[in-house]
Amino acid sequence: MFQSYPKLCDILKDKFKFILIDEYQDTNPVVVEIFLQHLKQSNRKNIIGFFGDSMQSIYEDGVGDLNAYIQAGEVYEVQKEQNRRNPSLVIELANRLRTDGIEQHPSTDNHAPNMQDGRVKEGNIKFYYSAQGVDDLETLKRTLDWDFDNAIQTKELNLTHNLIAPKAGFGELMEIYDDDKIIDYKNRITKYIKENNVATDFSEKTFGEVIEILKDGKTGRELNQVNPTPGMQTFIDAHSEQFEDAKQYPFDVFKKIYLDKDSLLDDTKKDKEDENKKGTKRDELIKHLFKIQNNINLYKEERYNEFLRKTEYRISSIADKQSLKDTIVTLDSMSDETIEDVIDYAHDNGICKKDDKFDTFLRDKEYVYTQVKRIKFQVFQNLFYYLEGYTPFSTQHKIKGAEFDNVLVVLDNGNWNKYNFEYLMNVEIFDGLTTLKKSSFEKILNRTQKIFYVCCTRAKENLVVFYNLPSDAIIEKAKMWFGEDNVIRI
């Protein structure tokens, strides 16, 4: 619109004489184009400032850098060379990691966070690796003797939630929401129906009946299109009872079930002081479980007025107070009971009623509830405390902008093919790659360089990087970056 209607450019410049854009590297290129190209249609004056660091452009939909505009004279660059956060050893490491030519140095401000007694803190950097075919991460954590219970001071940074889930104790829930190949197979079937314009009326059919109808009369390649892929079949073979249950659901209901990590993990806090964002993609079952745990916590923290508002629990006598206390004590001790038992107990005792949204979820996504309800409530509680920022675990993307005294960076791709830490620390690997992998090498390397830079520069005191089973080339690169004495085999 700004391109087509110059009057809008006049209005914007009249309204805002100064436009300051924070974290510019994450700004959509179209927005940058509006500010730096389309606004030139107006003769009115204003100033636009971009604040950020291109080395921290870790989101794919961001502009990344303004190099093209700088080279064209559209933007004047003021380089921020003073570093107020990191100790000197981390600053030196960060300078080795930077690819934009900027070299930072400690702030000269004696009141800067990284200054102590008029001098910049030295800090500590270490690169640990395991070479025995055993992941020695837990051994390393015991060796470090950091307080991993203090999520404000100490963080373990992993690339993906999938890597964190088993460590934080909610792996069973993660498998349901992010690794259900039966749902993937359902998606394969619905895609086949749509792309092949299958006109059959399936409204009265079950998922299993639809599969049989589509398979009927097909052989060879045609049959393969409606059969599970090998990966799906492996999952189905291992979860045969679950698959048989899935086949009994009405297809019109089952085809609308979609599962993804956001339904489970959206709105993850950096720490317990972080605020929840408005709106969340969590599904109604997870929201309901959150209400139960929040209500338990409100009572235990003696926030009784807030508890009564949230639950609408009625207290009219001393006996009611004692009954409520007994109920909370019982509910709080049900960690080893199933999620279904906890939901039913909380409902029956007025702690968290099953509302219309919960009932709708149960009706439309019974398949999901059937799996979740069998899991111990402790698994959900582990998820709760992870999402609420009580644990030391965080994804490497989540902590941009944050800072911690102690940072442990785990270099594991987690089967995410957009990143590759081996590329980062052994660029000579390029020559041995296939043609296809060579075509994506630069993009993957760029992403990995920047996420690693972001992770390392979160440390205010101590930085430790861990790599399981590195090659000799990776160890040599680590010695170049961290110093030979700081590269340690566990």
Describe each PLM feature range.
Residues M1-I490:
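The feature marks helicase ATPase cores and/or their adjacent C-terminal helical subdomains
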